[in-house]
């Protein structure tokens, strides 16, 4: 009996150690790239070309609201920017065509200068950054095994268990976990689990009899 308990404890310790080691390996791969860490901390994918982005020329409303926004913000310091924008939009609609005309003329002048300075400019709206998830899914057996380990630190193991599947939280091709290394670790964990199950059945005849009865006489 003590031999069975010691064997089970040893198997549990081996599995826990392998999972923690796998988590540390993933964490190291995640933090060894300073460029990737910078993108992760700032929440964006900044490139050198983004620094020289050409701003879109102002339209009539932008010319008018440039000073009005500052005025409303000074008069209402507690008002949020979204509320200020709503108020400015309402005030702009209430203006007459004669009141709007000077701002349309100023906007045309600004746009003409912009075309002269940037003749090849084309407006391209920026797309929202979408986090890139790894296209590699770990096996369901390994995922369920990780879900059963309640003591794995989330800081060490950047995966989420959902519906028997595990998806890596890395972004970018250079940050993805090496598939061959992950496969070796998964194979090792599965072998350890199979070895522990076989050892427990071999040392416990009652459990073995129940398992055989379940296999031959399914419900």
From Swiss-Prot:
<comment type="subunit">
    <text>Interacts with CALM, EP300, HDAC3, KPNB1, ZNF208 isoform KRAB-O, PARP1, SLC9A3R2 and WT1. The interaction with EP300 modulates its DNA-binding activity. The interaction with KPNB1 is sensitive to dissociation by Ran in the GTP-bound form. Interaction with PARP1 impaired its DNA-binding activity.</text>
</comment>
<keyword id="KW-0221">Differentiation</keyword>
<keyword id="KW-0804">Transcription</keyword>
<dbReference type="GO" id="GO:0030154">
    <property type="term" value="P:cell differentiation"/>
</dbReference>
<keyword id="KW-0539">Nucleus</keyword>
<dbReference type="InterPro" id="IPR036910">
    <property type="entry name" value="HMG_box_dom_sf"/>
</dbReference>
<dbReference type="GO" id="GO:0005634">
    <property type="term" value="C:nucleus"/>
</dbReference>
<keyword id="KW-0238">DNA-binding</keyword>
<dbReference type="InterPro" id="IPR050140">
    <property type="entry name" value="SRY-related_HMG-box_TF-like"/>
</dbReference>
<dbReference type="GO" id="GO:0001228">
    <property type="term" value="F:DNA-binding transcription activator activity, RNA polymerase II-specific"/>
</dbReference>
<feature type="DNA-binding region" description="HMG box">
    <location>
        <begin position="54"/>
        <end position="122"/>
    </location>
</feature>
<dbReference type="GO" id="GO:0016607">
    <property type="term" value="C:nuclear speck"/>
</dbReference>
<dbReference type="Pfam" id="PF00505">
    <property type="entry name" value="HMG_box"/>
</dbReference>
<dbReference type="InterPro" id="IPR009071">
    <property type="entry name" value="HMG_box_dom"/>
</dbReference>
<dbReference type="GO" id="GO:0005737">
    <property type="term" value="C:cytoplasm"/>
</dbReference>
<keyword id="KW-0963">Cytoplasm</keyword>
<dbReference type="InterPro" id="IPR017253">
    <property type="entry name" value="SRY"/>
</dbReference>
<dbReference type="GO" id="GO:0005516">
    <property type="term" value="F:calmodulin binding"/>
</dbReference>
<keyword id="KW-0805">Transcription regulation</keyword>
<dbReference type="GO" id="GO:0030238">
    <property type="term" value="P:male sex determination"/>
</dbReference>
<dbReference type="GO" id="GO:0007548">
    <property type="term" value="P:sex differentiation"/>
</dbReference>
<comment type="similarity">
    <text>Belongs to the SRY family.</text>
</comment>
<keyword id="KW-0112">Calmodulin-binding</keyword>
<protein>
    <recommendedName>
        <fullName>Sex-determining region Y protein</fullName>
    </recommendedName>
</protein>
<keyword id="KW-0726">Sexual differentiation</keyword>
<dbReference type="GO" id="GO:0000978">
    <property type="term" value="F:RNA polymerase II cis-regulatory region sequence-specific DNA binding"/>
</dbReference>
<keyword id="KW-0010">Activator</keyword>
<comment type="function">
    <text>Transcriptional regulator that controls a genetic switch in male development. It is necessary and sufficient for initiating male sex determination by directing the development of supporting cell precursors (pre-Sertoli cells) as Sertoli rather than granulosa cells. Involved in different aspects of gene regulation including promoter activation or repression. Binds to the DNA consensus sequence 5'-[AT]AACAA[AT]-3'. SRY HMG box recognizes DNA by partial intercalation in the minor groove and promotes DNA bending. Also involved in pre-mRNA splicing.</text>
</comment>
């Amino acid at each position: 009996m003590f031999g069975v308990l010691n064997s089970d404890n040893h198997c549990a310790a081996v599995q826990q150690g392998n999972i923690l080691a796998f988590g540390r390996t993933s964490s190291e791969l995640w933090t060894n790239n300073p460029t990737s860490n910078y993108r992760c901390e700032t929440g964006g994918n900044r490139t050198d070309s983004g620094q020289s982005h050409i701003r879109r020329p102002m339209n009539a409303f932008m010319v008018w609201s440039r000073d009005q926004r500052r005025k409303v913000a000074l008069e209402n310091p507690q008002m949020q920017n979204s509320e200020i924008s709503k108020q400015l939009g309402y005030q702009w609609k209430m203006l007459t065509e004669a009141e709007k005309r000077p701002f349309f003329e100023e906007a045309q002048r600004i746009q003409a200068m912009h075309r002269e300075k940037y003749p090849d400019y084309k407006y391209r709206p920026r797309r929202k950054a979408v986090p890139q998830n790894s296209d590699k899914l770990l096996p369901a057996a390994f995922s369920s095994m990780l879900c059963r380990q309640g003591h794995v630190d989330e800081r060490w193991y950047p995966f989420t268990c959902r519906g028997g599947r595990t998806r890596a939280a890395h972004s970018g091709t250079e940050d993805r976990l090496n598939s061959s290394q992950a496969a070796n670790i998964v194979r090792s964990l599965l072998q350890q689990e199979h070895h522990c199950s076989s050892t427990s059945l071999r040392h416990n005849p009652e459990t073995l009899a129940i398992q055989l009865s379940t296999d031959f006489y399914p419900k």
